[in-house]
């Protein structure tokens, strides 16, 4: 089994669950980075008390995603509202990364998936199915789940059809 570098994308309100997931992945031997950056009340990234330019944040995120073999999106009730989350997912897709969604423990059944995840992500799994994550990182395909870990009807993807000439 080859261990993979893993990048975790998340909403800042889900940091406690992020820490739980980081601990579980590290215990299994994975090297993990996350998109955790210090933000002020206006959701602007700060470092040593100063605002950081969006271009600098974007460069950091692209670099961290490039480093990773697998990209995980921690999906909470408000994850879909964050522009940086969609930015990170799109970048992971453009860099050819496997994109796996994990619902936050206790997440509402009707948690909305980020738009970019609907387009580029794999089948999401519930927090109670976190043991499946290692297999998914290694390429195993799992059926889509709802936040509680029960089977989804599978209708989560926006299908885009093109006609080739």
Language-model features: where?
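Conserved N-terminal substructure of TIR/SEFIR domains
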Residues: 1-67, 151-165
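C-terminal interaction surface of TIR/SEFIR-family domains
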Residues: 4-7, 52, 106-165
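Inter-motif core of Ras-like GTPase G domains
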Residues: 68-73
């Amino acid at each position: 089994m080859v261990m993979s570098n893993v990048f975790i994308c998340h909403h800042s309100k889900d940091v406690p669950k992020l820490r739980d997931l980081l601990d579980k992945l590290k215990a299994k031997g994975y090297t993990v980075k996350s998109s955790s950056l210090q933000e002020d009340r206006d959701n602007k990234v700060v470092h040593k008390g100063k605002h950081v330019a969006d271009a600098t944040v974007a460069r950091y995120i692209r670099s961290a995603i490039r480093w990773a073999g697998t990209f995980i999106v921690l999906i909470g009730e408000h994850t879909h509202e964050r522009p940086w989350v969609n930015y990170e997912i799109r970048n992971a897709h453009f860099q050819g990364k496997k994109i796996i969604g994990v619902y936050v423990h206790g997440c509402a059944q009707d948690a909305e998936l980020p738009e970019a995840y609907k387009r580029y992500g794999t089948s999401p799994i519930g927090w109670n199915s976190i043991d499946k994550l290692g297999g998914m990182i290694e390429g195993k395909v799992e059926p889509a789940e709802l936040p509680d870990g029960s089977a989804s009807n599978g209708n989560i993807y926006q299908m885009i059809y093109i006609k080739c000439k």
